[in-house]
């Protein structure tokens, strides 16, 4: 009989069992790889978000820093103002210089003939602005401006009463300055204003010598001299007004009282009939100036020369 030893060691697995185990192992490893991949993606997302946040914050900080480094318009203007603002001493010196320039121009206008004044402003146009800036400053201290009184008279006496008439009232503002009368009535249907001065500061004004106005004979209803009988040949201004006025037309004059030889203007009213102007009214109540209204009447023969009844208006030096 054969003796059989049953201790054969580990029993080998069949081929089918080995195949099943191999598949399970592959699935397990695949699952592990997937889990690792998911964790890696999540980790990458977190890292990217954090990196993006850091980048954004850094860029914002950079932009804020840039904005702070660039001054605003307000700060820039404030900085410029520091450089352009005059000190009180500089301002006083500037005011003194402006006042001296105004007085010098004013003296030239009153002590020379009008043709020389025209030439002066042609050569130096800025002088006209300097003069009128100084003149505005002087007028601010007056109780009222005579041009405003003339404007009120035009509104009350002529603008409304002439509204329905076909023909306009023609006004010549002689020595108009900045043409306040023309600008006031620029839309009026009943008043037509022609403005003349040595320089044309705006569209309303025609530059000319007041002794030679570019208007036809007897075409004007009202001629106005508002503080503008300047120059040593002021009588030629009045003769020119007589030429352009219609017979029966009105001459309005406003002048500083200190210019008249009698310090009131009554002697002026008595003398003007020699030039063909009949006195209609004279207003003496204002402390600064006198207002006149004359009417043009026919003159037979040559007009007489007036005596020296109107002196130059020279401002005192401070």
UniProtKB/Swiss-Prot annotation:
S-adenosyl-L-methionine binds at residues 132, 175, 197, 209, 226. Its EC number is 2.1.1.287. Residues 33-48, 62-83 have a biased composition (Basic and acidic residues). It comes from the Eukaryota. InterPro entries: RRP8, RRP8_N, SAM-dependent_MTases_sf. Coiled coil: none annotated. One of its GO terms (molecular function) is rRNA (adenine) methyltransferase activity. Keywords: Methyltransferase, Nucleus, rRNA processing, S-adenosyl-L-methionine, Transferase. It is found in: Nucleus, Nucleolus. One of its GO terms (cellular component) is nucleolus. The keyword Nucleus applies. GO terms for biological process: ribosomal large subunit biogenesis; rRNA methylation. S-adenosyl-L-methionine-dependent methyltransferase that specifically methylates the N(1) position of adenine in helix 25.1 in 25S rRNA. Required both for ribosomal 40S and 60S subunits biogenesis. Required for efficient pre-rRNA cleavage at site A2. Belongs to the methyltransferase superfamily. RRP8 family. This is 25S rRNA (adenine(645)-N(1))-methyltransferase. It comes from Schizosaccharomyces pombe (strain 972 / ATCC 24843) (Fission yeast). The gene is rrp8.
């Amino acid at each position: 009989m054969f003796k059989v030893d049953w201790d054969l060691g580990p029993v080998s697995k069949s081929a089918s069992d080995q195949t099943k185990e191999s598949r399970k192992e592959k699935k397990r490893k695949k699952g592990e790889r997937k889990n690792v991949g998911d964790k890696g993606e999540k980790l990458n997302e977190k890292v990217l978000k954090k990196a993006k946040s850091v980048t954004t914050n850094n860029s914002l900080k950079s932009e804020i820093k840039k904005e702070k480094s660039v001054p605003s318009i307000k700060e820039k203007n404030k900085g410029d103002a520091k450089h352009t603002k005059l000190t009180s001493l500089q301002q006083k010196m500037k005011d003194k210089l402006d006042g001296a320039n105004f007085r010098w121009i004013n003296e030239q206008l009153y002590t020379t003939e009008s043709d020389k004044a025209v030439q002066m402003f042609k050569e130096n146009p800025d002088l006209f602005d300097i003069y009128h800036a100084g003149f505005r400053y002087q007028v601010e201290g007056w109780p009222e401006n005579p041009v405003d009184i003339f404007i009120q008279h035009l509104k009350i006496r002529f603008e409304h009463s002439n509204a329905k008439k076909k023909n306009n009232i023609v006004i010549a503002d002689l020595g108009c300055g900045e043409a306040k009368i023309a600008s006031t009535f620029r839309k009026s249907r009943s008043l037509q204003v022609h403005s003349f001065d040595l320089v044309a500061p705006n569209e309303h004004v025609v530059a000319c010598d007041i002794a030679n106005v570019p208007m036809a004979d007897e075409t004007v209803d009202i001629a106005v001299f508002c503080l503008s009988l300047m120059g040593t040949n002021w009588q030629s201004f009045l003769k020119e007004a007589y030429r352009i006025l219609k017979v029966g037309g009105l001459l309005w004059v406003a002048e500083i009282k200190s210019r008249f030889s009698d310090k009131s203007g009554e002697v002026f009213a008595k003398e003007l009939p020699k030039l063909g102007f009949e006195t209609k009214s004279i207003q003496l109540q204002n402390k600064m100036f006198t207002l006149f209204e004359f009417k043009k009447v026919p003159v037979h023969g040559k007009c007489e020369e007036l005596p020296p009844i109107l002196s130059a208006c020279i401002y005192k030096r401070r």
